[in-house]
């Protein structure tokens, strides 16, 4: 199972993206990204699919 909170932060750091920039990339609000990174909420299935694709393209290990 993917730890989205950890992986989102890892991806942003690898790509030198702010939460705001990452939110724009996904078409969501900045507070949404903050909540995901804090583990307060999980992304929707549609967003998880986008995240998975970004993580794979970045060569990130997902397990």
What are the functions of these language-model segments?
Residues 13, 27, 38-40:
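Residue-level detection of the helix-turn-helix DNA-binding "recognition helix"
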Residues 16-34:
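Short alpha-helical DNA-recognition segment
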Residues 29, 40, 54, 58:
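The DNA-recognition helices of helix-turn-helix-type DNA-binding domains
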Residues 46-63:
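DNA major-groove recognition helix of helix-turn-helix/homeodomain DNA-binding modules
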């Amino acid at each position: 199972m993917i730890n989205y909170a950890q992986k989102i932060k890892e991806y942003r750091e690898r790509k030198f993206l702010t939460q705001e920039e990452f939110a724009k990339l996904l078409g969501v609000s900045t507070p949404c990204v903050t909540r995901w990174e804090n583990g307060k909420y999980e992304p929707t299935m549609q967003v998880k699919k986008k995240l998975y694709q970004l993580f794979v393209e970045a060569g990130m290990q997902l397990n």
